[in-house]
Amino acid sequence: SLVAVVITTFLYLIFRDSSPKGLPPGPKPWPIVGNLLQLGEKPHSQFAQLAETYGDLFSLKLGSETVVVASTPLAASEILKTHDRVLSGRYVFQSFRVKEHVENSIVWSECNETWKKLRKVCRTELFTQKMIESQAEVRESKAMEMVEYLKKNVGNEVKIAEVVFGTLVNIFGNLIFSQNIFKLGDESSGSVEMKEHLWRMLELGNSTNPADYFPFLGKFDLFGQSKDVADCLQGIYSVWGAMLKERKIAKQHNNSKKNDFVEILLDSGLDDQQINALLMEIFGAGTETSASTIEWALSELTKNPQVTANMRLELLSVVGKRPVKESDIPNMPYLQAFVKETLRLHPATPLLLPRRALETCKVLNYTIPKECQIMVNAWGIGRDPKRWTDPLKFSPERFLNSSIDFKGNDFELIPFGAGRRICPGVPLATQFISLIVSSLVQNFDWGFPKGMDPSQLIMEEKFGLTLQKEPPLYIVPKTRD
């Protein structure tokens, strides 16, 4: 009809010239939806293809949002290092805009005084080498509990991500509160509701919210995602609120100290909301991303028997038949190379967490306008054939004689980010990922349901805040001779 033509023409004229001048090149956007329809279900993969056409930096219009994507080590270095301060703002997903949480969050808040205070506690108290080493026995005991649980399920099909996720929840329960959250295999034990809330948060983080592309929809919460996040946070806070209350009372009646995060946080001067937000992010980031990484690691091991054999030779040489200890990890270069290779191909957050420009600035001679959203395609950088030989081949050997690391200085490998926004828990995360993987390799062979051949294993990805394997990995543990 004539009315439809007039409306369409009007909207086109509005959106046609809405992009700021001087942006990096990119595909031509459609009216209203921009480039949304070009992304498909795997934006990280589509971004890598677009980089082949448009280069280091390209721009998109996602709904009404202007987005710039960095796709090479050079562009990543410019974003995360050279212009780190001015591009250090955080774009907060609509579903996670829970005021009390965002204002006290180390992940989502601006780099303000509260953020600096929280960051300092992480850097100087929680994730120091001394603190990590002092809690090694806790992580080792939880890893062995996982091994014992799987030994009881030899011959049975297990969803390994759930087993690992539960193990990580208990690891963090002990690191933070000095207690298990629940018992593996017993769904009626302990604070199972907290495990369920954490799992639900993972699902919400991996869901799409149209309000991220059309912010005016945020006020309506059409799909109830914001309410779901708020309810999950409240449920989690209520569980450990009781634990914190008990600890405060105990501290008032005796002077004994426990070697855990809560002891440090209660002595740090943080208020309850800051403690709640920090614990949520330690639990959330530590469990969700690490469980995904370990699932991918085991998937690669089952598809690459020679890699498994190489790791077992190293384990036998360094560890023998006793349980693996974290102190063994520095003496196992192949294990370390294996973890790097897993993170290269399967970074848990494929586009990192989006940044936001605090001011208009120039990057590689292009204009990045104020409030622009910036993504760094860590997944694409890790698979770039210009940077890696045979990039799709899983080969830990590529790191054996290489100084490349994932600590934020080598921009061809940035699974944890870089700059002031780098994940503060990198030293801890790499320890328990290495510990759990090596413990599983040492103790088990693996089969597949219905005798499926490893070559048939599907290695598809499900895009979200974390990059999950699709379908999930189901394997059958077998005792080793």
Swiss-Prot record:
It is found in: Endoplasmic reticulum. Heme binds at residue 423. Pathway: Alkaloid biosynthesis; (S)-reticuline biosynthesis; (S)-reticuline from (S)-norcoclaurine: step 3/4. One of its GO terms (molecular function) is iron ion binding. Keywords: Alkaloid metabolism, Endoplasmic reticulum, Heme, Iron, Metal-binding, Monooxygenase, Oxidoreductase. It is an enzyme of class 1 (oxidoreductase). Its EC number is 1.14.14.102. Its cofactor is heme. Induction: Up-regulated upon elicitor treatment (at protein level). It catalyses: (S)-N-methylcoclaurine + reduced [NADPH--hemoprotein reductase] + O2 = (S)-3'-hydroxy-N-methylcoclaurine + oxidized [NADPH--hemoprotein reductase] + H2O + H(+). It comes from the Eukaryota. GO terms for cellular component: endoplasmic reticulum. Cytochrome P450 monooxygenase involved in the biosynthesis of benzylisoquinoline alkaloids. Catalyzes the 3'-hydroxylation of (S)-N-methylcoclaurine. This is (S)-N-methylcoclaurine 3'-hydroxylase isozyme 1. It comes from Papaver somniferum (Opium poppy).
